[in-house]
């Protein structure tokens, strides 16, 4: 799963651009939209509202066509962590200007009458002025510049820290898949991502894959997730 942001001030065309991306891309894309408005998405008096007020940490409403999760506010890191469990190619983040900067996520900056120029920095992968863009150029930027979210791991295996790595990707001096987290193996210990060099990642991945494939009901797996409760290995 790779991420890229779309930022700009009000009426700069952010949502319209994302709509066009979704219409023209053949990739599986999730969208995160930030709003400063205090929107009440659940209605007072409904069953889900009552259950949430009664103390449910998460309330899930399932209909025949949609599923909605009601929970407390989540920061961008936690939202991305949840989305990583889905079979998604890209996540487009609308807004979250400060979080994008903090998490070193590249972005497309939308300008309207030059308004928004202050948002441009060394993580800006593309600048779009006054709605003028070619959608193929936008898709090319997304496919080449979106990165795997590192959460500021700063492991150094790529030869950079996370901030300078994204800067290098934006400038074309590095590829997004130079990051060790893009190699298909993610090791998480007690909630902390543990970086592994490609050689170690390949050994771990190949070993687990070979073991899993011997189990009944496993046929040509595409993704494998193993969670171990160490306290129960006694």
Swiss-Prot record:
- Residues bound to [4Fe-4S] cluster: 155, 158, 162, 179
What is the protein name given in its UniProt record? Putative molybdopterin-guanine dinucleotide biosynthesis adapter protein
Q: Which GO terms describe its biological process?
A: Mo-molybdopterin cofactor biosynthetic process
Q: Give binding positions for GTP.
A: 11-15, 42-45, 86-89
User: Could you give the cofactor binding note from the entry?
Assistant: Binds 1 [4Fe-4S] cluster.
User: Which Gene3D superfamilies does the UniProt entry name for this protein?
Assistant: P-loop containing nucleotide triphosphate hydrolases
Q: Which Pfam families match?
A: FeS, MobB
Q: Superkingdom of this entry's organism? A: Archaea
- Segments forming domain 4Fe-4S: 134-196
Family, according to the entry, reads as follows: Belongs to the MobB family.
Q: Which organism is it from?
A: Methanocaldococcus jannaschii (strain ATCC 43067 / DSM 2661 / JAL-1 / JCM 10045 / NBRC 100440)
């Amino acid at each position: 799963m790779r991420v890229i942001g779309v930022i700009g001030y009000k009426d700069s065309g952010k949502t319209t651009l994302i709509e066009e991306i979704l219409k023209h891309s053949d990739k599986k894309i999730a969208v995160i939209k930030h709003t400063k408005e205090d929107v009440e998405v659940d209605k007072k008096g409904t069953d889900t509202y009552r259950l949430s007020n009664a103390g449910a940490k998460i309330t899930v409403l399932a209909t025949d066509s949609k599923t909605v999760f009601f929970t407390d506010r989540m920061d961008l890191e936690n939202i991305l962590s949840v989305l990583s469990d889905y079979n998604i190619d890209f996540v487009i983040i609308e807004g979250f200007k400060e979080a994008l900067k903090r998490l070193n996520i590249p972005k497309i900056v939308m300008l309207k009458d030059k308004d928004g120029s202050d948002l441009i920095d060394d993580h800006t992968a593309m600048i779009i002025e006054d709605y003028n863009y070619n959608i193929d150029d936008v898709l090319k930027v997304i496919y080449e510049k979106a990165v795997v979210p590192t959460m500021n791991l700063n492991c150094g295996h790529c030869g950079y820290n996370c901030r300078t790595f994204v800067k290098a990707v934006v400038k074309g001096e590095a590829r997004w898949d130079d990051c060790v987290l893009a190699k298909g193996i993610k090791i998480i210990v007690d909630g902390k991502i543990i970086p592994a060099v490609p050689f170690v990642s390949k050994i771990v991945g190949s070993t687990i894959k070979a073991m899993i494939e011997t189990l009944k009901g496993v046929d040509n797996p595409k993704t494998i997730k193993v969670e171990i409760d160490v306290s129960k290995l006694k």
